[in-house]
Each structure stands twice: as structure tokens, then as C-alpha cells.
Amino acid sequence: MKQLLDFLPLVVFFIFYKMYDIFVASGALIVATLVALAFTWLKYRKVEKMTLVTAAMVLVFGTLTLAFHSDLFIKWKVTVLYVLFALALLVSQWVMKKPLIQRMLGKELTLPDKVWSTLNLSWAIFFLVCGLLNIYVAFWLPQDIWVNFKVFGLTALTLIFTLISGVYIYRHMPEEQKKS
């Protein structure tokens, strides 16, 4: 249910873009994000930090898009968000000495430190690559292609990378965890 709530604003953005334009879609994205955030809080009494960061970015960049009537801001949001995620992963590994991925999943999974580090670094690189891809698609291709890439391309890439990560984790799990 939480994943559906996280995905809902993106669907709203896509629908409003196809029906109207990037500015109406940006406004709808802000509203849908705030509604999803409120619903998540009311239902679970907890909102994940990543969701809060994403909502803050939507609010800031969406508002700038509307205030300056420029799609540059909403296009940059994706890259800035992905770079922030990558930086959080890298700082957790190199400065705080415990990968963020391990902090998030370590209670459920027992994996060697090297596996946690590799997984954490892989996700950081993934986010940086997606951020760079977004810059290319957003600023060198037509807006329609960027919207489709943002909604479907990045979602598909994230799903594929999640599956690859799952296979990698499974290969390194202790046998007793694989059985349960």
C-alpha cells in the first residue's frame, strides 16, 4: 500500500500532463504528493525520510516551476533528488562507516560487510547514472519524451535494478535465511 501511495503522485502528474500541460501537471503533482503524505501519516503514523525528502523536493521545485512558469525546475528536480540520494548513500559508507542500505535492511538480512558496501555503492552509482540520464533526456529531447522517461523509463530502471539487487542479495544470504 505504501508503494502505491508513493507512486500515485507520479501517475497523477502523467495524467494531468497528457490532459493539460507541464504546469497543470506540476500543480497536480504538488497536491497529489501532499495528499499522499497526509494519508500515509494518518494511516501509518509514520513517514519515511526518503518520502519526506521527495515531498520537499516536489514542493520546492514544483512551486518554482509554477512561480517562474518554467519547466526547467521540475526537470531538474529528478536529477537533484537522485544526486541527494547518491550523496546520502556515499556519505553513509565513507563518513559514517555504515552503509545506509545496511541500516535500512540490516535487521531483516544478515550479509557480509563487503556485500553491504557493494550494494550501497551500486545504488549510489545507479542514482548518479539516472540523474545524468535525466539531464540528457530533459534538456536534449522533447518534453513529451522526458515525461514518458520520467514516469516509465526511470520507474522501469528502478524496478530492474531492484530485481538485480535482490538476486545479488539472495546469492550472498546465509542458507538458513534462504529457507525462511
From Swiss-Prot:
Keyword Transcription regulation included in the entry's annotation: no
Broad class of the protein's primary localization: membrane
Cellular component terms per the entry's GO annotation: plasma membrane
Membrane-spanning residues: 22-42, 50-70, 72-92, 121-141, 149-169
Alphabetical list of InterPro entries matching this protein: YciB (IPR006008)
Membrane topology term: Multi-pass membrane protein
Coiled coil segments of this chain: none
UniProt-annotated location(s): Cell inner membrane
Annotated keywords: Cell inner membrane, Cell membrane, Membrane, Transmembrane, Transmembrane helix
Pfam families to which the protein is assigned, alphabetical: IspA
Function: Plays a role in cell envelope biogenesis, maintenance of cell envelope integrity and membrane homeostasis.
Recorded family membership: Belongs to the YciB family.
Cross-referenced NCBIfam families: ispZ, PRK00259.1-2, PRK00259.1-3, PRK00259.1-4
Record-linked HAMAP family: YciB (MF_00189)
Name used for this protein in its record: Inner membrane-spanning protein YciB
The organism of origin for this protein: Yersinia pestis
Lineage of producing organism: Bacteria, Pseudomonadati, Pseudomonadota, Gammaproteobacteria, Enterobacterales
